[in-house]
UniProtKB/Swiss-Prot annotation:
Function text: Component of the ubiquinol-cytochrome c reductase complex (complex III or cytochrome b-c1 complex) that is part of the mitochondrial respiratory chain. The b-c1 complex mediates electron transfer from ubiquinol to cytochrome c. Contributes to the generation of a proton gradient across the mitochondrial membrane that is then used for ATP synthesis.
Name of the protein this chain belongs to: Cytochrome b
Miscellaneous notes: Heme 1 (or BL or b562) is low-potential and absorbs at about 562 nm, and heme 2 (or BH or b566) is high-potential and absorbs at about 566 nm.
Native organism taxonomy: Eukaryota, Metazoa, Chordata, Craniata, Vertebrata
Biological processes, Gene Ontology terms: mitochondrial electron transport, ubiquinol to cytochrome c
CDD domains: cytochrome_b_C, Cytochrome_b_N
Length: 379
């Protein structure tokens, strides 16, 4: 078997990626989240496949087909709640994965980092079109509000919105194409994950110390397969607790009301994992400015390799930047909170301050702290 896995054309790829892969001996549990994201993706594809067997992408029957899945299909309620809460677990792992990348300076592996940003955007697009499918009130109005943002694009905006809608409003054509997008995008994500891993294995993994670890590497299996297994068990336990005991805690009660174009919900808001970006969007009074800020809130991650001037790798020995990093995380939590609040004083003002802080930390404070720390090293 040993010779086969090293010589067989297909098994050789698996062997070099997951078994004999030379891995730094000191990587911590923060490196577990890559494999957890892979597990989340597998759970989402499998549960989504079974849901797609019973779902109908028609405005008249979409809502009742979801109710039918929960009531009449064997374990349909479990599959539905695993899929809905699995998305939340996916984004929790994704945020931690990106946060770890920033903290330990993984953005210096620029190809891997940039593919990661594309993956992040694709996952957000998948989650958005998926949220529209149950055709509840928040699904309908979320789709209307977010797709309408494209009308802010000069000259082609209105035409583009109607082209995406497939008509003059969010209707049957929109739901059908969103279902098609939601079905195909996870497979595109899977392909991008393979490219992400390809670039990662080209350079090798980063490690907590930020030093070159070529002289001290161990095989991925059995050391990290068992370490990852613990993380996977904890993830599955958390997901099952969510799906079985608190299935609706992260959802919106408005989505249990069928979509009604004549009745607008009091507060239109997306799922919790989009709230930080939604808060940034709302904090700018101008429509086009808001859309640009929304896009930049994710694309700004691509500036990390460009703005990094530090002579040290990662933040482990950099107390000034470490402090700024944790302020950034706290600010992100404030933005998430503000995104779920109504558009009124003092929430609008807090949102504007937090949005300025979000961009200010990345573009101004982190490069300044890099320079200060470089000068301290010279002393």
């Amino acid at each position: 078997m040993k010779i086969m896995r090293k010589n067989h054309p297909l098994l050789k790829i698996v062997n070099h990626s997951f078994i004999d892969l030379p891995t730094p001996s000191n990587i911590s549990s923060w490196w577990n989240f890559g494999s957890l994201l892979g597990i989340c993706l597998m759970i989402q594809i499998l549960t989504g496949l079974f849901l797609a067997m019973h779902y109908t992408s028609d405005t008249t029957t979409a809502f009742s087909s979801v109710a039918h899945i929960c009531r009449d299909v064997n374990y349909g309620w479990l599959i539905r709640y695993l899929h809905a809460n699995g998305a939340s677990m996916f984004f929790i792992c994704l945020f931690i994965h990106v946060g770890r990348g920033i903290y330990y300076g993984s953005y210096t592996l620029s190809e891997t980092w940039n593919i990661g940003i594309i993956l992040f955007l694709t996952t957000m697009a998948t989650a958005f079109v998926g949220y529209v499918l149950p055709w509840g009130q928040m699904s309908f109005w979320g789709a209307t509000v977010i797709t309408n943002l494209l009308s802010a694009i000069p000259y082609i905006g209105s035409t583009l919105v109607e082209w995406i809608w497939g008509g003059f409003s969010v209707d049957k054509a929109t739901l059908t194409r969103f279902f098609a997008f939601h079905f195909i995008l996870p497979f595109i994500i899977t392909a991008l994950v393979l490219v992400h891993l390809l670039f990662l294995h080209e350079t090798g993994s980063n490690n907590p110390s930020g030093l070159n670890s070529d002289s001290d590497k161990i095989p991925f299996h059995p050391y990290y397969t068992f370490k990852d297994l613990l993380g996977i068990l904890l993830l599955l336990m958390a997901l099952m607790i969510l799906a079985l005991f608190f299935p609706d805690i992260l959802g919106d009660p408005d989505n249990y009301t069928p979509a009604n174009p004549l009745n607008t919900p009091a507060h239109i808001k997306p799922e919790w994992y989009f709230l930080f970006a939604y808060a940034i969007l709302r904090s700018i009074p101008n429509k086009l400015g808001g859309v640009l800020a929304l896009i930049l809130s994710i694309l700004i991650l691509a500036t990390f390799p460009l703005l990094n001037t530090s002579k040290q790798h990662g933040l482990i020995y950099r107390p000034i930047t470490q402090t700024i990093y944790w302020i950034f995380i706290a600010n992100l939590l404030v933005l998430t909170w503000i995104g779920g609040q109504p558009v009124e004083y003092p929430f609008t003002m807090i949102g504007q301050i937090a949005s300025i802080t979000y961009f200010g930390i990345i573009i101004i404070l982190m490069p300044i702290s890099n320079t200060i720390e470089n000068n301290i090293i010279k002393l």
